[in-house]
Amino acid sequence: MITIGTALRPAATRVMLLGAGELGKEVAIECQRLGIEVIAVGHYADAPAMHIAHRHHVINMLDGAALRAVIEHERPHFIVPEIEAIATDMLVTLEQEGHHVVPCANATRLTMNREGIRRLAAETLSLPTSRYRFAADRAELDKAVEAIGYPFIIKPVMSSSGKGQSLVRDAAQLDAAWQYAQLGGRAGGGKVIVEGLVAFDFEITLLTINAVDGIHFCAPIGHRQEDGDYRESWQPQHMSALARQRAQTIAADVVTALGGKGLFGVELFICGDDVIFSEVSPRPHDTGMVTLISQDLSEFALHVRAFLGLPIGTIRQYGPAASAVILPELQSDNVSFSGLENALAAGQQIRLFGKPDLSGKRRLGVALAVAATVEEAVTVAKDAAAAVRVTG
């Protein structure tokens, strides 16, 4: 029997979010719906999840000592990473001491580093992946390029949202790509992965939930990326029955190997009936924000249910739906939004994240839409996002 204590009382069930961005905010909201006490930890003040958490802390989460200190101070029942830039070795140690890391510390450690998850997928599980090599210095990079050939993608093994990532078409671009990769890593310069290009029809995110009542899948989510970050996502992505079956098999193998209960965002390339593994996040995925309007249980609700040990049951997908990001470009620490009345027709919703500032481009919200077809939903969501005016 699962027992949930009431927030701010001695028997409270406490959830600590490591990362307080827009995804963490939605996880916090789902915890609040169940009366759970929420502590948000982030690397900058006034982050979105901090607005609604019972308490919050600002620390460098790559500092293992600082991470241990805040966890020992708050004594959470569940430690829920929302970002990759965390001292994962400390999470492993804390888990060994009896703390509950979601889904588990090993999954967080492996997926923070592209080398760990790629070797697990390709070498341990023998899943189909792109051709790849790792390089720790410039000399190793030359050897990796010789083995993979042009064109290729270079990425820091520790980065996210496209940071440090480049498409390299010829040798003239190699030096700049290497330098960019060294600047883009979450923990500073370091090892990179060199990946051969994959011929694919489209990419999907397959939200996969490992729960007390088994493994569950959301309908596949298609998405468009630009500069390494998502711009629109939609659900369901049409694909053949065989490809969908293969995608679910790969996703189940990956999340089972990683271990722990929770929701995982499994990224896959689809080419006809063939499926190639790309990456996985052991947490809600940004492309999955479409589930805020497309399903009866969003990816955030599913994650919370799973890590609490509650059953998932049946996930109901309502039909064609899409999300489109609100991505302004300006300098401001006093942002305002207008034009919302033009973005809220029937079948449309807006989420504004409440980020405190921006310097250049930053994702500040998302438009959500349902429609008769996926294509129409994408158009409606993009138009709604464009209707929101951001000033500051």
UniProtKB/Swiss-Prot annotation:
Listed EC numbers: 6.3.1.21
Taxonomic placement: Bacteria, Pseudomonadati, Pseudomonadota, Gammaproteobacteria, Enterobacterales
Protein name: Formate-dependent phosphoribosylglycinamide formyltransferase
Swiss-Prot/TrEMBL catalytic activity: N(1)-(5-phospho-beta-D-ribosyl)glycinamide + formate + ATP = N(2)-formyl-N(1)-(5-phospho-beta-D-ribosyl)glycinamide + ADP + phosphate + H(+)
Annotated ATP binding sites: R114, K155, S160, S161, G162, K163, G164, Q165, E195, G196, L197, V198, E203
GO terms assigned for molecular function: ATP binding; magnesium ion binding; phosphoribosylglycinamide formyltransferase 2 activity; phosphoribosylglycinamide formyltransferase activity
Residues that, per the record, bind Mg(2+): E267, E279
Organism: Sodalis glossinidius (strain morsitans)
SUPFAM superfamilies noted in UniProt: Glutathione synthetase ATP-binding domain-like, PreATP-grasp domain, Rudiment single hybrid motif
The keyword Repeat is annotated on this UniProt entry: no
Functional description taken from the UniProt entry: Involved in the de novo purine biosynthesis. Catalyzes the transfer of formate to 5-phospho-ribosyl-glycinamide (GAR), producing 5-phospho-ribosyl-N-formylglycinamide (FGAR). Formate is provided by PurU via hydrolysis of 10-formyl-tetrahydrofolate.
NCBIfam families found in the cross-reference section: PRK09288.1, purT
Family matches, as HAMAP family: PurT
GO biological process, one term: 'de novo' IMP biosynthetic process
